[in-house]
Design a protein with these regions (language model features):
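Ligand-binding clefts of soluble mixed alpha/beta catalytic domains
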Residues: 1-456
Length: 456
C-alpha cells in the first residue's frame, strides 16, 4: 500500500517553472511478507532520474519513522541519478537525514537494500549502512568514485562499479543476481529474521526430526556450507556475503524453528557438481575477521544465537594481510567476547593457537563448546612443537615426541579434561546436540557492566 503519493518537490531558484514530478521520484509504502509487516521505499528513475532532493529524502525518512514505531523491517530499492543539483544544500541535508535515520534504526529493526540501478557517490553509504545489501547483476552499479575517475584505473581493465567487483571486494554486498533472485532472497531473509530487536528468534515451526542423524557430517568439514545445510531444519542454509572473504562463511540456519547465526572457517569451496572450485589455507585473514565481526554484531543486536564451526590453525602470513590483520582480529575477538546472545562453538578439525582462541572459544565467552573425536586443540601442530622443543633430535625422535605432545597437549580429550571442551561428540549426532544446547540457552541473561559503548 503506497503512502505519500502526492508529495512533490518544493520550488527553488532553479526549478520554479519545472513540471510537477509524481511522488518526487520515490515510492514509499508498507506491505506483508509471509504475514510479516515491512516498510518499503523504491526510487523511480523515470521521475527526475530518481535523484535525491529535500522531499524525496523526507519521504524515505518518514518510512523509517513508521517502521521504528511499528518495529518492522525497512526494505529499500535504489536506482538513483545522484543528488539533485537544483536543490543544492537542501538535497545534501536530505542525504544526512537518510544517514541519520539508518543509524538510529541500526540494531532496532533489520534494514535490507537492493541496488537495481545506479548507486553512486554519497548514496553508496545507504546500502553500506544497511544490514544486508544486494546488487542486480547487469544493471546495478555501486561506487563512491566512478571507475574512470579513479587514478590509475581504466574502465576496460577494472570496472569497480560492477556488481561482481563490489560483491567480492567491499564487504557490504550479500549477493548479486537478477531482480527476481534478489527479491526472492529478501523475502527469505525477512522470514528468517526477528522483526525487531525485541522479536522472537523462533520464526518458524519445525517438522524435521530433532534427533535426525547427520551421517555425512564427517566428510563435510572442508566446506561448512554443506555441513550447515546438513544440520539445519529441512537442510536450509541462508548464506550472507557469499562472494566476500570466502574462507569465512556466515549465514543463518534453523534449529527446531529457531534462527541461528553461523560463522565457520572454510578451506574448500565446492561447485554445484561437487567438484573443488577453490581452496584456502586454514588461516584467519583480515577480510574474514571483519566479515565475522560484523555478522556477530548483527546477531547480538537482535539476540540471534550464534554457532561457530572452528577449523583453523593460524593467520595468513603475507605483507598485505599483516597491514590489517591485528586490527581485524581484535575486532572479531571483541565481537565474540562482548556478544551476550547464546554462543555455541563446535570444533570440527584443527584449533591451534590464538586463532582458535579468537574463534568463539570458551576463553572469550562461548557458553558451550563441542568437539569431534578427531579434533586437535592446542598451541600448534604437534610436529612443529616437537621440532621447536627438541632442535637437535633426529626424525624418529621428533615423530615420537610429536606423538607424545599430541596425546598430552593437543588432543581433544586433554582439552576436555581442562574444561575447554564441554562434550566430545560423534559427527552424526551434531544436530541433536546443537538443538539441545540452544534450547537450554534460550533464556540466557547477562548482567553486563554499565557503559555507554565499547570502543572496537
Amino acid at each position: 500500500m503506497e503512502i505519500g503519493s502526492l508529495v512533490t518537490a518544493r520550488s527553488t531558484d532553479f526549478n520554479l517553472t519545472a513540471a510537477k514530478a509524481p511522488s518526487d521520484g520515490v515510492i514509499i509504502g508498507q506491505g506483508l511478507i509471509d504475514g510479516n509487516l515491512v516498510f518499503i521505499y523504491s526510487q523511480d528513475a523515470t521521475v527526475l532520474n530518481g535523484t535525491i532532493g529535500e522531499m524525496h529524502a523526507k519521504k524515505i525518512a518518514s518510512v523509517y519513522d513508521m517502521a521504528m514505531k511499528m518495529g518492522a523491517p525497512v526494505i529499500g530499492f535504489i536506482d538513483c541519478g545522484g543528488i539533485r543539483l537544483q536543490e543544492s544544500v537542501d538535497a545534501l541535508d536530505g542525504f544526512g537525514l537518510i544517514y541519520a535515520k539508518e543509524v538510529a534504526a541500526s540494531g532496532v529493526i533489520p534494514q535490507i537494500c537492493g541496488v537495481f540501478g545506479n548507486c553512486g557517490g554519497g548514496l553508496s553509504v545507504v546500502p553500506a549502512l544497511c544490514d544486508f545489501a544486494y546488487i542486480e547483476e547487469s544493471k546495478g552499479r555501486m561506487f563512491v568514485n566512478t571507475p574512470d575517475a579513479i587514478e590509475g584505473n581504466r574502465v576496460e581493465k577494472c570496472d569497480t562499479a560492477a556488481a561482481s567487483f563490489q560483491s567480492e571486494n567491499n564487504g557490504c554486498v550479500d549477493g548479486i543476481g537478477s531482480e527476481d533472485d534478489i527479491i526472492a532472497d529478501i523475502r527469505a531473509l525477512v522470514s528468517m529474521l526477528p522483526l525487531n530487536n525485541e522479536g522472537d528468534v523462533y520464526t518458524d515451526s519445525c517438522e524435521d526430526d530433532l534427533n535426525r542423524a547427520c551421517n555425512s557430517m564427517a566428510d563435510m568439514k572442508a566446506d561448512p556450507r554443506f555441513l550447515l545445510s546438513e544440520l539445519s531444519d529441512d537442510h536450509v542454509f541462508f548464506e550472507t556475503k557469499k562472494d566476500f572473504a570466502k574462507n569465512m562463511v556466515t549465514g543463518f540456519v534453523k534449529l527446531n524453528g529457531m534462527t541461528v547465526g553461523a560463522v565457520a572457517n572454510c578451506s574448500t569451496v565446492y561447485d554445484a557438481e561437487g567438484k573443488k572450485a577453490e581452496e584456502f589455507a586454514l588461516s584467519l585473514t583480515a577480510k574474514g575477521c571483519n566479515k565475522a565481526a560484523e555478522f556477530v554484531s548483527f546477531c547480538d543486536a537482535f539476540s540471534i544465537p550464534v554457532l561457530t564451526l572452528t577449523n583453523v590453525n593460524g593467520f595468513k602470513n603475507c605483507m598485505c594481510s599483516e597491514k590489517k590483520l591485528a586490527k581485524a582480529l581484535a575486532r572479531m575477538t571483541y565481537a565474540f567476547s562482548s556478544a551476550t546472545c547464546p554462543k555455541v562453538n563446535l570444533i570440527t578439525g584443527e584449533a591451534y593457537g590464538s586463532a582458535y582462541v579468537a574463534m568463539n572459544s570458551k576463553s572469550i565467552g562461548a557458553d558451550m563448546v563441542y568437539a569431534y573425536h578427531d579434533a586437535k586443540i592446542g598451541m600448534m601442530d604437534s610436529k612443529i612443537a616437537a621440532e621447536i622443543m627438541y632442535p637437535g633430535a633426529d626424525a624418529k625422535e621428533i615423530d615420537e615426541k610429536a606423538a607424545d605432545y599430541e596425546k598430552l597437549q593437543s588432543s581433544v580429550s586433554s582439552a576436555a579434561a581442562r574444561g575447554y571442551v564441554d562434550l566430545i561428540i560423534d559427527p552424526a549426532d551434531t544436530r541433536k546436540y546443537l538443538v539441545g544446547a540452544f534450547e537450554m540457552l534460550y533464556t540466557k541473561y547477562v548482567d553486563a557492566p554499565e557503559k555507554k559503548h565499547g570502543t572496537k
